[in-house]
Amino acid sequence: MSKKTDDILDSLKTLSLLEASELVKQIEDAFGVSAAASAGVVVAAGGAAGGGAAAEAAEEQTEFDVVLESFDASAKIKVLKAVREATGLGLGDAKAMVEAAPKTIKEGIAKNDAEALKKAIEEVGGKVSLK
């Protein structure tokens, strides 16, 4: 590379995200181009090269399964009540679910709901994991 392009690259590395976004808009206006069209090509090429799997892994998980792993024997009734409250199951079904631990209690729920349910069950003596 030339000294001039090296200097430009070094300057670009110091930009914040907001400044970089503003720079892209200015370049689009000045040269009459769109960065969106070329970005789509880069994403498509990355997906074809196997980079898509890495990108998917980097995405934050949005749905969780709440799994009752185990519980303290002395806390069985409290765990049973917490499971009934969370699932709306009857006493017999909730009891069967708790006794079958490890068992999935809820599937595909939002992160906040999953964490709240995990906290509620752990507070009464259950051991819960989110998957």
Swiss-Prot record:
Disulfide-bond pairs as recorded: none
GO cellular component: cytosolic large ribosomal subunit
GO BP annotations, alphabetical order: translation
Alphabetic keyword roster: Ribonucleoprotein, Ribosomal protein
A GO MF label: structural constituent of ribosome
NCBIfam families linked to this entry: L12
Full protein name: Large ribosomal subunit protein bL12
UniProt organism field: Prochlorococcus marinus (strain MIT 9313)
Taxonomic classification: Bacteria, Bacillati, Cyanobacteriota, Cyanophyceae, Synechococcales
Gene name tied to this protein: rplL
